[in-house]
Amino acid sequence: LKEVGVDAQILSSDMLRKVITPKPKYTEDERDIVYGALVFIAELLTKNGVNVIIDATANRRRYRDEARRRLPKFIEAYIRCPLEICIERESKRIGETYHAPRNIYKKAFTGESKTVPGIGSPYEEPLNPEVIVDSDKLSPDECAEKILKAIKRHFY
């Protein structure tokens, strides 16, 4: 977006969760609080002219539906990826670049965690996202370009 002159604030669910719940349990109640806070912050920012990108799994449709209801200029970008590719990518995360928890799939498969979306916790696929990006088939640049085209199509 910066390359085309559009500034945006990224709201990361993982970063916000660390502030709200320093020792997260990933319960349904905790997720309700975190996703509710994300939408609330996005709503405040957009009312003040700030473009917002919400970076979140939002494993329940109700979280995405609430964002769509409360944010007037909203598009849902579904970044689709097969589970085996997610597992491979997560295993290669290094450094502090990623704010997401580590070894989530390993913990899910060993029974240490029962809250990983799509494994121990439900993941409800979007029904009508404005754009679908198959991140296992496209490069990161191609994914970004497809999302940018959807943004332009809806707002410019």
List each language-model region with its residue ranges.
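Conserved phosphate-donor/acceptor-positioning beta-strand/loop module used by diverse small-molecule
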Residues: 70-90, 133
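Conserved substrate/cofactor phosphate-moiety recognition/catalytic segment
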Residues: 1-47
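Conserved catalytic network of the ASCE P-loop NTPase/AAA+ motor domain
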Residues: 43-47, 68-72, 123-125
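Small-molecule kinase domains that catalyze NTP-dependent phosphoryl transfer to phosphate-bearing small molecules
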Residues: 92-146, 155
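Short catalytic-loop micro-motif centered on adjacent basic/acidic residues
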Residues: 52-55, 132-134
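Short, hinge-like loop/turn segments at secondary-structure boundaries
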Residues: 26-30, 70-72, 93-98
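Conserved nucleotide-binding/hydrolysis micro-motifs of P-loop NTPases
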Residues: 15-17, 58-60, 80-86, 138-139
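Loop/turn-to-beta-strand initiation segments
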Residues: 48-52, 75
